[in-house]
Amino acid sequence: MPHRKKKSFINKKNAVSFHLVHRSQKDPLAADETAPQHVLLPTVRVELEKRKEEQRNFGVFFDDDYDYLQHLRESTQTAELISAPRVRRDTRLKPADDEEHMKEEDSSVSEASIKLPSSVFASEFEEEVGLLNKAAPISGPRLDMDPDIVAALDEDFDFDDPENMLEDDFIIKASDVMGGGGGEDDDEWEDTDDDDGEEQDFDSEAGLSDDEEGGRREFMFADCETKTRFTEYSLTSSVMRRNEQLTLLDDRFDEFYKQFDDDEIGALDNAELEGYIEPDSARLEEVIKDYFIQKEKDCQKPDQLGPAELPSVREEDEEDEDADEELETERMVIEPPAERWDCETIISTYSNLYNRPKLIQDPPKPKQIRVSSKSGIPLDVLPKRGLTVKQVERMERINDSDLPRVSTQPRSRDENTEERKARKQAIKSERKERRTKKKANKLAFKQEKQMQEKQMVHLRANVQGMKLS
């Protein structure tokens, strides 16, 4: 009997893993004692993330669940054939019903079926504020509460003040005040409305008068000094009355911000602007026009450069000139003046550091180098005569160690026989040393020449071998 592979209880491909976590504070069931305080949270599929990371290494960046690695496997890898379960179909179904039935089967096979109660999962709807934040005390001013209650909670309410003590019949008085206080007041209001018939402006800061409302106005905010140097009302003054501590705090705040008034703050630092502007921009043309207009205003005319004259003398001179012009009038043809070119520009009025006008010169052409056809040496480069002064100076700077030491020394006239023998012997030894060095140099040059010839022979043989191959 053949061995059959036992079907596993859990299909790892379609299986879903969960984490057991605490229920969220925003969950409405967090305050329910019957509901479990721990819920199941589906885990993120790590294998999918690993597969996507491996796909990125191969250059596949598609963000879907398809396995592209199956097309990148080796062709020599063995494949395993898994038989699919047989699905029974009812032949009596209609074609349309048959297609719907096939879609339902495919969806049922592909999707994992989870049959767990909803209480083990988190609620779909969550509240905006958590359970612990709801129970937390509220800090800050309460605009929706009565100022007396806020003052009492902050321990700023003066219980010893006789005005703050309630009388025995305060409920009856309060009901009389809220009831309207009689029909005479109503008649007065109706009469004023009928007589005026126009819109009236009411001051919101002044409040209601004692004649109109009686004892309704006990604690009005208009009695308190709530204005600051920034706003008409402060945040705390809109909720509670100002006591000594709050007034002192406001005074310190105003005193501190006096340092930032317009009179106290100095001029701001100039901003360093960087950028590029086109030479033909309209903004640059406007600036240049303004500059010329300002220069025309500042410059003086030739008439203004001389000594000041009395106005009477100036008027007489002008009258004489007008009379002469009226008497002698000749017609002359005035030609327009020729346009004059000048090297001075608007930049030269500031500085001549970069503006240096001069004639444009044609640079001399470089002399053509001629080469000798025999030697290949450029002509007119080497000296034609003897040594120049620089060459003589260079020869004189030669190191003395390169010249003969004994032979170059002058012979003394007063030398004796022993000194002459010693001098001749030194010259002989020096010449012998020079002959030895000369012989060694010749031998070294000869060996180097032979070695280079051998290298050339080997190189030619290698080149010929490469050509033949």
Curated annotation (Swiss-Prot):
Residues 183-213, 315-328 have a biased composition (Acidic residues). Disruption phenotype: Knockout disrupts ribosome biogenesis and embryos display aberrant cartilage structure, defects in digestive organs, characterized by smaller size of liver, intestine and exocrine pancreas, and impaired definitive hematopoiesis. This is Protein LTV1 homolog. Essential for ribosome biogenesis. Involved in organogenesis of digestive system and definitive hematopoiesis. Residues 88-112, 175-219, 298-329, 394-454 are annotated as: Disordered. One of its GO terms (cellular component) is cytosol. Residues 444-467 form a coiled coil. InterPro entries: Ltv1. The gene is ltv1. Keywords: Coiled coil, Ribosome biogenesis. Residues 88-106, 394-403, 411-433, 445-454 have a biased composition (Basic and acidic residues). GO terms for biological process: cartilage morphogenesis; definitive hemopoiesis; digestive system development; ribosomal small subunit biogenesis; ribosomal small subunit export from nucleus; ribosome biogenesis; rRNA processing. Belongs to the LTV1 family.
